[in-house]
């Protein structure tokens, strides 16, 4: 059965006959992402965006801090996140962001993001990156990797120079938008730090026009930035730092040659930072060729997030939708992401979910870019509880309201499984991963358990809400009634 090319993002089945529609959600802005709705709408009008700097300058001028003032009193802090956190993010050395001698304007942006103290990956990365040394960092999904490289990147900018000084390469368009939003928010008090996102699927001419103005930081997908470099539009001869986020994907066969071509255009004394949850042989080869005495960070004693509880349910293919309906009726879902193995199955499942009476978005790579942007933006802002998607949505995407991930189709690769379930349990919070397993999936299930050194348990008749529902926990450890 074929499915036509998707022309519009679909909000499916906005009925309220089930318990899932309880008004708009407001995901908290945590260390992996977030941002104001206005910023996100502006970002998503075009996939390639640049902050003007004028707003940031105005903010800085309106809240000038004189020496000796208690500058922290002027900060507009978000509500404190009282959800329980696991040792993935709490097992730190006790450092403070102020220990790294960062610019006060940068510290203001950090604290206003709600980042109170550095996570383990940030503690390890920030001082080394500030020293100018290359880094090979391995850390779990959702533990603060974006902050680990954006903070030193912004600290090292010289805003007096009218040139691109840093570049962040990511594998997907949605991740590029997310990282650029974080970068703009963290740098908003720096008075003129200009950040541009550029991705494929958007108007190249718009990017060329934006690069005529001052740009300090470029956040891009590989193909688009290489195109701009080859056209002589993106001048990269003054770049001092390049970051490869999700390095294992960027150095896979899909992107390897493009990444090699990009690296060859950069100055020889540039700093390279590699971040990923997994490091296959391709990453090791790249490190040997291009990194100079890299500082290696490995915070991966175990691969899966401590806060994610994993279950499986044995079903036939025909029972999957019925099983999903049962899960929807019994689980207390804040937001869920449901993975399928093909674009066609994504659309078919989204239609089925809407027929069951549940609200549902879907997203996959065959959709037009502006529609992907809108779905990403609206789901992140809590306009819908459930998102059906392909593996397009597994890389780095940080939506902290997601507490349940369902593998409607079980993946074949351990790496894919790891990235999928990492969409819940972000930044040390709790989450649930449920896998629908057919007879043909049973060998993959066993293999993935062995490769990841994890246990995927049979699903019980009733799942304890303390395992995945945020409001059942507080920092004091007391359960709410």
From Swiss-Prot:
Motif Q motif in this chain: 95-123
Motif range (DEAD box): 245-248
Top EC class for this record: hydrolase
Positions of ATP binding: 139-146
Gene Ontology process terms (BP): miRNA-mediated gene silencing by inhibition of translation; negative regulation of translation; P-body assembly; stress granule assembly
Name under which the protein is recorded: ATP-dependent RNA helicase ddx6
Region (Disordered): 1-41
EC annotation from Swiss-Prot or TrEMBL: 3.6.4.13
Gene of this entry: ddx6
Subunit structure and binding partners: Component of a ribonucleoprotein (RNP) complex, composed at least of cpeb1, lsm14b/rap55b, ddx6/Xp54, ybx2/frgy2, pat1/P100, eif4enif1/4E-T and eif4e1b. Component of a ribonucleoprotein (RNP) complex, composed at least of elavl1/elrA and/or elavl2/elrB, igf2bp3/vg1RBP, ddx6/Xp54, ybx2/frgy2, lsm14b/rap55b and, in a subset of RNP complexes, stau1/staufen. Component of a ribonucleoprotein (RNP) complex, composed at least of lsm14a/rap55a, ybx2/frgy2, ddx6/Xp54 and eif4enif1/4E-T. Interacts with lsm14a/rap55a.
Compartments (UniProt record): Cytoplasm, P-body; Cytoplasm; Nucleus
Tissues expressing the protein: In adults, expression is restricted to the germline cells of the ovary.
Source superkingdom: Eukaryota
Family annotation (InterPro entries): DEAD/DEAH_box_helicase_dom (IPR011545), Helicase_ATP-bd (IPR014001), Helicase_C-like (IPR001650), P-loop_NTPase (IPR027417), RNA-helicase_DEAD-box_CS (IPR000629), RNA_helicase_DEAD_Q_motif (IPR014014)
GO CC annotations, alphabetized: cytoplasm; cytoplasmic stress granule; nucleus; P-body; ribonucleoprotein complex
SMART domains attached to this UniProt entry: DEXDc, HELICc
Keywords noted in UniProt: ATP-binding, Cytoplasm, Developmental protein, Helicase, Hydrolase, Nucleotide-binding, Nucleus, Ribonucleoprotein, RNA-binding
UniProt family annotation: Belongs to the DEAD box helicase family. DDX6/DHH1 subfamily.
Reactions this protein catalyses: ATP + H2O = ADP + phosphate + H(+)
Domain Helicase ATP-binding: 126-297
Primary role: ATP-dependent RNA helicase that is an integral component of messenger ribonucleoprotein complexes (mRNPs), storage particles that mask maternal mRNAs from the translational apparatus during oocyte maturation.
Residue span(s) of domain Helicase C-terminal: 307-467
């Amino acid at each position: 059965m074929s499915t036509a090319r998707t022309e519009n993002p679909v909000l499916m089945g906005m009925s309220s006959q089930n318990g899932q529609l309880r008004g708009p959600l407001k995901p908290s802005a945590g260390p992996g992402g977030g941002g104001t709705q206005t910023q996100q709408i502006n970002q998503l009008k075009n996939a390639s965006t640049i902050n003007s700097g004028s707003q940031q300058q105005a903010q800085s001028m309106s809240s000038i801090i004189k020496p000796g003032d208690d500058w922290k009193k002027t900060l507009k802090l978000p509500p404190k996140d009282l959800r329980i956190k696991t040792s993935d993010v709490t097992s730190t050395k006790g450092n403070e962001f102020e220990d790294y001698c960062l610019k006060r304007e940068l510290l203001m942006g950090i604290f206003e993001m709600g980042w109170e103290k550095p996570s383990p990956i940030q503690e390890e990365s920030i001082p080394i990156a500030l020293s100018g040394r290359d880094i090979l960092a391995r850390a779990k999904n959702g533990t603060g990797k974006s902050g680990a490289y954006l903070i030193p990147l912004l600290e090292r900018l010289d805003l007096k120079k009218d040139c691109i000084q840093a570049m962040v390469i990511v594998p997907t368009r949605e991740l590029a938008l997310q990282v650029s939003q974080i970068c703009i928010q963290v740098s908003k008090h720096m008075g003129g730090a200009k950040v541009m996102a550029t991705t494929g699927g958007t108007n190249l001419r718009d990017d060329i026009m934006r690069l005529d103005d001052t740009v300090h930081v470029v956040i891009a997908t590989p193909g688009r930035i290489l195109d701009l470099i080859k056209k002589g539009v993106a001048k990269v001869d003054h770049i001092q730092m390049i970051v490869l986020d999700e390095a294992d994907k960027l150095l896979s066969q899909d992107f390897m040659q493009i990444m090699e071509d990009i690296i060859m255009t950069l100055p020889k004394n540039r700093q390279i930072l590699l971040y990923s949850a997994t490091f296959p042989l391709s990453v090791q080869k790249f490190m040997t060729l291009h990194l100079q005495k890299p500082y290696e960070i490995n915070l991966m004693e175990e691969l899966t997030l401590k806060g994610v509880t994993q279950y499986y349910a044995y079903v036939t293919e025909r029972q999957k939708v019925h099983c999903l309906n049962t899960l929807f009726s019994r689980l207390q879902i804040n937001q869920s992401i449901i993975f399928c193995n093909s674009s066609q199955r994504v659309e078919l499942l989204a239609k089925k979910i809407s027929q069951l009476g549940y609200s549902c978005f879907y997203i996959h790579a065959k959709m037009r870019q502006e529609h992907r942007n809108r779905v990403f933006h609206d789901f992140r802002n809590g306009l819908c509880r459930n998102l059906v998607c392909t593996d397009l949505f597994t890389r780095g995407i940080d939506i902290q309201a997601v507490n349940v991930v369902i593998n409607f189709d079980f993946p074949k690769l351990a790496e894919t499984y790891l990235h999928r379930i990492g969409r819940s349990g972000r930044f040390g919070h709790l989450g649930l991963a449920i896998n629908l397993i057919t007879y043909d999936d049973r060998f993959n299930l066993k293999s993935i358990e062995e490769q990841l050194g994890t246990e995927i348990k049979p699903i019980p008749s009733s799942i304890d809400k303390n395992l995945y529902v945020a409001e059942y926990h507080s920092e004091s450890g007391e359960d709410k009634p």
